[in-house]
Amino acid sequence: MENTSITIEFSSKFWPYFTLIHMITTIISLLIIISIMTAILNKLCEYNVFHNKTFELPRARVNT
């Protein structure tokens, strides 16, 4: 019976720290993934030639 009480006490002390560390690591990993995705999308928009032309062509048609 002493072993079960020790494990329950250890798990009750350990569980909040585990969930807090898990939440912090997931938030940090999500921020890293989102920043990498935004950097990739910005580079794709810079190298895409048709990205700027789609905004310029309707203005040219309206002016003429």
Curated annotation (Swiss-Prot):
An MF annotation (GO) of this entry: channel activity
Gene name, Swiss-Prot/TrEMBL: SH
Family the UniProt entry places it in: Belongs to the orthopneumovirus small hydrophobic protein family.
Post-translational modification: Four species of SH have been detected in infected cell cytoplasm: a 7.5 kDa non-glycosylated form (SH0), a 13-15 kDa form that contains one or two N-linked carbohydrate side chains of the high-mannose type (SHg), a 21-30 kDa polylactosaminoglycan-modified form of the protein (SHp), and the isoform generated by alternative translational initiation. Of these different forms, SH0 is by far the most abundant protein detected during virus infection. Tyrosine phosphorylated.
Keyword Magnesium: no
Protein name: Small hydrophobic protein
Subcellular location field: Virion membrane; Host cell membrane; Host Golgi apparatus membrane; Host endoplasmic reticulum membrane
GO biological process: monoatomic ion transmembrane transport; symbiont-mediated activation of host apoptosis
Annotated site residues (Involved in opening and closing mechanism of the pentameric structure) in this chain: H22, H51
The protein's role, per its UniProt record: Viroporin that forms a homopentameric ion channel displaying low ion selectivity. May play a role in virus morphogenesis and pathogenicity at various stages of the viral life cycle. Accumulates at the membrane of the Golgi apparatus in infected cells and may facilitate virus release by modifying the secretory pathway. May enhance host membrane permeability and disrupt cellular ion homeostasis, which can be sensed as damage-associated molecular patterns/danger signals, triggering NLRP3 inflammasome activation and inflammatory immune response.
Transmembrane portions of the chain: 20-40
Subunit and partners: Homopentamer forming a funnel-like pore. Interacts with glycoprotein G; this interaction occurs on the surface of virion particles and infected cells. Interacts with host BCAP31 (via C-terminus); this interaction is direct.
Pfam families attached to this UniProt entry: SHP (PF03579)
Positions of region (Interaction with host BCAP31): 6-15
Residues of this chain annotated as glycosylated in UniProt: N52
GO-annotated cellular components: host cell endoplasmic reticulum membrane; host cell Golgi membrane; host cell plasma membrane; membrane; virion membrane
Region Interaction with small-molecule inhibitor, residue ranges: 38-43
This protein's UniProt keywords: Activation of host caspases by virus, Glycoprotein, Host cell membrane, Host endoplasmic reticulum, Host Golgi apparatus, Host membrane, Host-virus interaction, Ion channel, Ion transport, Membrane, Modulation of host cell apoptosis by virus, Phosphoprotein, Signal-anchor, Transmembrane, Transmembrane helix, Transport, Viral ion channel, Virion
Regulation: Channel activity is inhibited by copper. Also inhibited by small-molecule pyronin B.
Membrane-topology annotation of the record: Single-pass type II membrane protein
